[in-house]
Amino acid sequence: MSDETTSSPSPAPAKKKQNLGWMEWMRGWSSVFGEILFQRITASHLENPLPLPSVNDLTCVVTGSTSGIGRETARQLAEAGAHVVMAVRNTKAAQELILQWQNEWSGKGLPLNIEAMEIDLLSLDSVARFAEAFNARLGPLHVLINNAGMFAMGEAQKFSEEGYEQHMQVNHLAPALLSVLLLPSLIRGSPSRIINVNSVMHSVGFVDPDDMNVVSGRRKYSSLIGYSSSKLAQIMFSSILFKKLPLETGVSVVCLSPGVVLTNVARDLSRILQALYAVIPYFIFSPQEGCRSSLFSATDPQIPEYWETLKNDDWPVCPFISQDCRPANPSEEAHNTETAQRVWKKTLELVGLPLDAVEKLIEGENIQCRYGAQHE
């Protein structure tokens, strides 16, 4: 009888997921069209404009606030008494808006406490410099609203000056870098909030952490893939940040859908789709309607309680607020915690931050970033 033992064959390695499955894809598009067709019905209980609680002591940073949802968000927060920092690429346009708003507000109360600071989300160096300048004030930040976004529908693939696909940088990488770098100010402002204006389009998104620029050839690039992937990446990164921030910091992280809104993002649509936007106003929110979920997430007193409940329940994704200002559940792929962890690590690598950046900032330590004045 032979003494040799027969070894069992090693299991074949699991096949790497290349894209959404058909059922996931169909459920995703069902969510998209459901929001388009029924958002007015589901949000019919909301007032327009949305009444806000007292925000007199809040300092709020709103990116992309010279047009669309961001413009309405900044204006309404300022009129409600908040100190608003318009974080924008075009500071001249922001200053003109501030002057206009001050004139319109004249005689209604104290002058609006609003200012403009320059930031360009297509430049990570600009993002880091903005954070450095804001943190240098040594004041509190109570609400960061990552509102700026882009959807260059139909355009060929383009890259930022750092070499990253433009949707991924503007919609995910730059807001992620800004959120982490502003943690010192957010902790000073505790209880505080990071609000990410996301989209129901994340439901049809898929992220390959090894190919976030969609250049490997495994997937054919389209602007739709670029946009939806960036929005899913933002939720995944936010979900890990949600887990890493202890309750003691008092910093909440929320993603939201504003609904389908007639904004300057529509300027990037094809002429046919722009025409459709014009003829179906019943289905499309105005910017004033679209900003309600942003304002709700930024100011409602129940948000920190909801955030704490999800943390205590070890919920796998960060809080997500729908266009009707109710809690919602992101897509099935957004719950993929393994991919989310890889997206977290890859994002920090791409934006030039150490893997322990959040932990160090919570402890009050300094960190090194590949971008900004400190790297000169």
Swiss-Prot record:
Residue list for modification N-acetylserine: 2
Segments forming a coiled coil: none
UniProt-listed Enzyme Commission number(s): 1.1.-.-
Binding-site residues for NAD(+), renumbered to this chain: 61-85
Positions with a binding annotation for substrate: 199
Sorted UniProt keywords: Acetylation, NAD, NADP, Oxidoreductase
SUPFAM superfamilies: NAD(P)-binding Rossmann-fold domains
Pfam annotation, one family: adh_short
Gene Ontology CC terms, in alphabetical order: endoplasmic reticulum
Expression (tissue specificity): Expressed in roots, stems, leaves and flowers and, at lower levels, in siliques.
Loss of function: phenotype: Disruption of the development of the vegetative shoot apex. Abnormal leaf positioning and impaired shoot apical meristem (SAM) maintenance, leading to the death of most plants prior to the end of vegetative development.
Family: Belongs to the short-chain dehydrogenases/reductases (SDR) family.
Job description of the protein: Putative oxidoreductase. Required for vegetative shoot apex development, especially during leaf positioning and for shoot apical meristem (SAM) maintenance.
Protein name: Dehydrogenase/reductase SDR family member FEY
Gene encoding the protein: FEY
